[in-house]
């Protein structure tokens, strides 16, 4: 790790501390993710190795943050015979994320909506990145604006905090004891379903889409119960007809029977094609949700010059 100079701690990721650092030889900025690893006798656990090779494979897409290399640091532990081991994942450094970007349009001296063309461009890249991950059998499971990094001058979006699903399980609280946000979590996950698939990410993509249009979260719940109420109030309480098996899910209660509202009211500035795409992302039945790959061919993107992607 001598070849990097840590400049500042930029956050506590879901899996450990994140530093902005400079590669001393080149002056290149990188993001260092320090992950805590329980070492076994053989060294790095095979699950972690699998995840890292997955990350390297996914890095081939321009819409996924690039994993540049992995540094393995041993620190002999004074208390016991074992060595404490840290794994540093070295990623390309990006200066902002979608949450900060949306906030810059909402706050500040000159608040204004994001241009429809810009939303379209960012959404296309997000769907491309998610389609890439899904085509390799990887679910993100925690997509949110904070995990989408931006190269502002190029209007380029990249998915971060990816793939560390099984070796580093997503905790309910992060290391700083911030509650991990529920705003982008799919209803089947909130209801305790253990079998979930690519639809969980597409629900999150829909919530992010609406948030770019509204400049505020679509479903800002502060508990799992509240989160479901937010969803049901807008989209109506799901029925067995709409979503077979919903009433058998672990945390299903008898909720008030709300009728669905017109989604247009939540995103008044979105074009009819945009509302149609959003509706397909926010289907209750995960099997009916549009896939990322199919979304790329949706009429909402017809006016976009796709050759630039």
Curated annotation (Swiss-Prot):
Occurrences of domain Protein kinase (ranges): 4-301
Outcome of gene disruption: No apparent stomatal abnormalities. The double mutant cdkb1;1 cdkb1;2 has a reduced number of abnormal stomata consisting in single guard cells (GC). CDKA-1 partially rescue abnormal stomata phenotype of cdkb1;1 cdkb1;2. The quadruple mutant flp-1 myb88 cdkb1;1 cdkb1;2 has a reduced number of large single guard cells blocked at mitosis, with strongly altered shape and size and characterized by enlarged nucleus due to endomitosis and endocycling, as well as extensive chloroplast replication.
Domain of life of the native organism: Eukaryota
Residue(s) carrying Phosphotyrosine: 15
Main location: nucleus
Reactions performed catalytically: L-seryl-[protein] + ATP = O-phospho-L-seryl-[protein] + ADP + H(+); L-threonyl-[protein] + ATP = O-phospho-L-threonyl-[protein] + ADP + H(+); [DNA-directed RNA polymerase] + ATP = phospho-[DNA-directed RNA polymerase] + ADP + H(+)
Amino acids binding ATP: 10-18, 33
Regulation: Phosphorylation at Thr-14 or Tyr-15 inactivates the enzyme, while phosphorylation at Thr-176 activates it.
Outcome reported for the amino acid change (mutating residue 15 to F): Decreased kinase activity and disturbed cell cycle
Tissue: Highly expressed in guard cells and stomatal precursor cells of cotyledons. Expressed in roots, stems, flowers and siliques.
EC category name: transferase
Cellular location(s): Nucleus
PROSITE patterns: PROTEIN_KINASE_ATP, PROTEIN_KINASE_DOM, PROTEIN_KINASE_ST
SUPFAM superfamilies given in the database record: Protein kinase-like (PK-like)
Residue numbers of Phosphothreonine PTMs: 176
SMART domains referenced in this protein's UniProt entry, alphabetically: S_TKc
UniProt-listed PANTHER family: CELL DIVISION PROTEIN KINASE (PTHR24056), CYCLIN-DEPENDENT KINASE B1-1 (PTHR24056:SF539)
Family membership: Belongs to the protein kinase superfamily. CMGC Ser/Thr protein kinase family. CDC2/CDKX subfamily.
Assembly: Interacts with CKS1. Interacts with CYCU3-1. Interacts with SIM, SMR1 and SMR2.
Protein name according to UniProt: Cyclin-dependent kinase B1-1
């Amino acid at each position: 790790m001598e070849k990097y100079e840590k400049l500042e701690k930029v956050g506590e990721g879901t899996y450990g501390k994140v530093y902005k650092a400079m590669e001393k030889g080149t002056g290149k900025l990188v993001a260092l993710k320090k992950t805590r690893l329980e070492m076994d006798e053989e060294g790095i656990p095979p699950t972690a190795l699998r995840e890292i090779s997955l990350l390297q494979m996914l890095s081939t897409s321009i819409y996924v943050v690039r994993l540049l290399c992995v540094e393995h640091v041993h620190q002999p532990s004074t208390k016991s015979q074992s060595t404490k081991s840290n794994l540093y994942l070295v990623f390309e450094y990006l200066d902002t994320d979608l949450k900060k970007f949306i906030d810059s349009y909402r706050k500040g001296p000159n608040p204004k909506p994001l241009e429809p063309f810009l939303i379209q461009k960012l959404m296309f890249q997000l769907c491309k990145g998610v389609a890439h991950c899904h085509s390799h059998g990887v679910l993100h499971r925690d997509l949110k604006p904070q995990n989408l990094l931006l190269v502002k001058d190029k209007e380029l979006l990249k998915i971060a905090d990816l793939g560390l699903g099984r070796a580093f399980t997503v905790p309910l609280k992060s290391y700083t004891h911030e509650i991990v946000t529920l705003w982008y979590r799919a209803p089947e996950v909130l209801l305790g379903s253990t079998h979930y698939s690519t639809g969980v990410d597409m629900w999150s993509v829909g919530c992010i889409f609406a948030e770019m249009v509204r400049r505020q979260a679509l479903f800002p719940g502060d508990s799992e119960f509240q989160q479901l109420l937010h969803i049901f109030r807008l989209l109506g309480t799901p029925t067995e007809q709409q979503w077979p098996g919903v009433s058998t899910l672990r945390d299903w209660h008898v909720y008030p029977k709300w009728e669905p509202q017109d989604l247009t009211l939540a995103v008044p500035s979105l074009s009819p094609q945009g509302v149609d795409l959003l509706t397909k992302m926010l289907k209750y039945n995960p099997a009916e949700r549009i896939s990322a790959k199919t979304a790329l061919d949706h009429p909402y993107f017809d006016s976009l010059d796709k050759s630039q992607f």
